[in-house]
Amino acid sequence: MKRFWKDVAIDADRVVTLDGKPVRTPGRRPLALPSDALAEAVAEEWRAVGETIDPRTMPLTGLANAATDPIANDPTQFAARLAAYGESDLLCYRAEGPPPLVERQAASWDPLLAWARGRYDVTFAVTAGVMHVAQPAATVARLHEAVVAYDDFRLAGLSPVVTLTGSLVIGLALIKGEIDADAAWAAAGIDEDWSVEMWGEDWQAAELRALKRKEFGVGVEFLGLL
């Protein structure tokens, strides 16, 4: 679609407008943002559009659309899908060896699990290897409660953080300010970093990882604007 507007503004309800008309989501709802900072950031994406609209250059708009349409339609179900990552959290699956990798995982992941234990009154079953280990029912329930408590926009921002790291604990630690984006990404990438150190990295894997890091960063930015 070609650009058809000249002026981008924000109305009193924090709805982004194009030549005075509200931007609408794919579900035809006005795109109303919950904070001035996010409204301005989304408006800036629309101001930056060239001759044609490219959704890939408007990731904050995309997450806002997700919050306003599919997540708002059934936030409990969406939150449950995110909370399910706690049942097979990356941090609970450790390498069997070599010792330096085991130690690196423990140094990064043990403090995060300890934080979650104290914050949410949960316990975790940790294993070596990739075979699934069931988490205590109380842990699953309490982590679910923690995620369901978030509003639609925070769920939208949390989604790429959790899905790209494979860790609900990392996502919760980040949104609560326990760790920053760089520490979160580093914790999630320990296994990949080890493989690169041992055997090198091909360009396709490097490109894919860079794309994932960018998408992860958008989620972090989105959360920071709320």
Range-by-range predicted roles:
Residues P55-M58, A128, G200:
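Short coil/turn segments at secondary-structure boundaries
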Residues A48-E51, R117, D121, L174-I179, ...:
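Generic secondary-structure signature for well-ordered alpha-helical cores
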Residues T76-R142:
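Internal, conserved structured core segments that host functional sites
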Residues A206-L226:
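Long, charge-rich low-complexity segments
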